[in-house]
Design a protein with these regions (language model features):
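Short glycine/acidic-enriched loop and turn motifs that connect beta-strands
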Residues: 94-97, 141-145, 200-201, 241-243, ...
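A short beta-strand motif characteristic of beta-propeller blades
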Residues: 69-71, 112-118, 163-175, 213-218, ...
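Asp-box/WD-like beta-propeller blade repeats and closely related beta-sheet repeat scaffolds
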Residues: 161-203, 213-225
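Short, conserved, GDST-rich strand-edge loop motifs in beta-rich repeat architectures
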Residues: 82, 88-95, 138-151, 338-352
């Protein structure tokens, strides 16, 4: 079938109008010498021929229009606006896609996701220094995706553009554990990044953030995790109920390491490892709901008097703390936030539907905040008008509340796959 195409428009762009094809059975053409001759090619007849001509012409016009479009820009990265105290990092271990850990940056005021980091296998969480210019992320990768040679690194991200700007290779020993706040931490001056290892021998990797080099490994046999107490000091919790207090030199080597007395009754009422810090004091809750303040001193760590989170009547009603990150603190207001639920012994990982708020001076509950969804992780911003962030492994969403009134504000839903630890910059 032969179809006459429309002429090009005078300007050379776009498409001209299309007239119906003639219904003659034969067409007449002119030879190169100008002699008219009859063509043996059959022309399309009637409405069918017209439709075919229109379709072909339209396709040609579409191709012409596409060719005239300017190319889309690629590789453009928009910098973030100035950081807000209401931003929060939502770490996602991605249980259903384990090699593909992620960290999402969310603006609590707008409920919008500002950016995302791809953070590798068995991801435990990012670390945000006080200076806010960079983000540190301990990560693991395998040469064949889910197998092959393992490489552990600390990836350094620009906190404004969320792009990698450096990488420090570390020994492939980083603990592949359920994400928890104590798995990695910076010393108080942001100089050294400490990363918990479990092979099953327990140790800490030390990274100098100034020189961007691996410094060495510190043995913490029988103890776990890392809780900073100063520019060069931190402690780990030991299996016998004691603490291992370590002091570093300016080169990141061990200057002093000593065990305290056993502060914790590990047989009758052990602590969870999910502590929160206010000033020089770390606060830990026991399985039975007793709060243990551990205060750093120039010579080590001392245990201040404990106090109960639950009254005897509440204990008979089986109220317990529980969750993956079940405590949060607002330092300025002196408030402790705790996820609670009703359950029996060994339910310290269960999700909760309420947040109980305590005054850290009077040791009394002053507020109860009902959650819209069961939650396992909470975090509170540290500004004068704080937000309360809440999420859980079971619901890939982030709920946001006014931390003062307890009023629900908004949700980011969905968000990731299995959100875990929350970090405020």
């Amino acid at each position: 079938m032969t179809v006459r195409l429309p002429r090009k428009s005078p300007a050379g762009r776009g498409c001209s109008s299309i007239s119906p094809a003639p219904s003659a059975s034969r067409s007449v053409s002119t030879s190169e010498h100008g002699t008219a001759r009859r063509s043996d090619v059959i022309q399309p007849r009637g409405r069918a021929g017209t439709c075919a001509a229109l379709a072909l012409a339209a396709s040609v016009c579409g191709a012409t229009a596409r060719a005239q479009l300017p190319p889309d820009p690629a590789g453009t990265i928009e910098p973030l606006p100035p950081a807000s105290p209401h931003w929060v990092w939502v770490n996602d271990v991605a249980f259903f896609a384990f090699p593909d850990g992620r960290a999402f940056l969310v603006d609590g005021d707008s409920g919008k996701m500002l950016g995302m980091l791809s953070t590798g296998y068995s991801f435990t969480g990012v670390v945000a220094p006080k200076a806010r210019g960079l983000i540190y992320s301990p990560e693991s990768y395998f040469s064949r995706g889910t197998r092959g040679t393992r490489t552990d690194v600390v990836t350094i991200y620009d906190a404004t553009r969320l792009v990698p700007v450096g990488e420090i290779e570390i020994p492939p020993k980083r603990a592949s554990v359920m994400p928890m706040p104590g798995a990695q931490a910076l010393t108080d001056d942001d100089r050294f990044l400490l990363i918990y290892n479990y092979t099953p021998a327990q140790s800490l990797t030390v990274v100098d953030t100034r020189s961007r080099k691996f410094v060495g490994e510190i043995e913490i046999a029988g103890c776990a995790l890392v809780y900073p107490t100063g520019p060069r000091t931190f402690f780990s919790i030991c299996g016998d109920g004691a603490l291992l207090v370590t002091t570093l030199t300016d080169e990141g080597k061990v200057a002093r390491s000593a065990r305290t007395a056993a502060f914790i009754d590990v047989l009758n009422d052990p602590l969870t490892e999910k502590g929160v810090r206010r000033g020089d004091t770390w606060l830990f809750a026991s399985f039975e709901g007793v709060l243990h303040p551990l205060r750093s001193t120039p010579t080590g760590v001392e245990a201040d008097p404990t106090w109960p989170l639950f009254t005897p009547q509440e204990l008979t009603q089986h109220w317990r703390t529980g969750g993956l990150q079940h405590l949060a603190v607002h330092g300025g207001r002196g408030r402790l936030f705790a996820i609670v639920h009703q359950g029996g012994p060994e339910t310290h990982k269960d999700l909760g539907e309420q947040i109980w708020v305590y005054d850290l001076v009077s040791h009394r509950r002053v507020q109860t905040i009902a959650m819209r969804n069961k939650v396992g992780s909470i975090q509170v911003s540290q500004d004068p008008r704080p937000l309360l962030f809440a999420c859980s492994l079971e619901n890939n969403r982030l709920d946001i509340y006014d931390a003062t009134s307890g009023k629900y504000l908004r949700s980011v839903d969905p968000l990731g796959l299995t959100p875990t630890v929350l970090v405020t910059p």
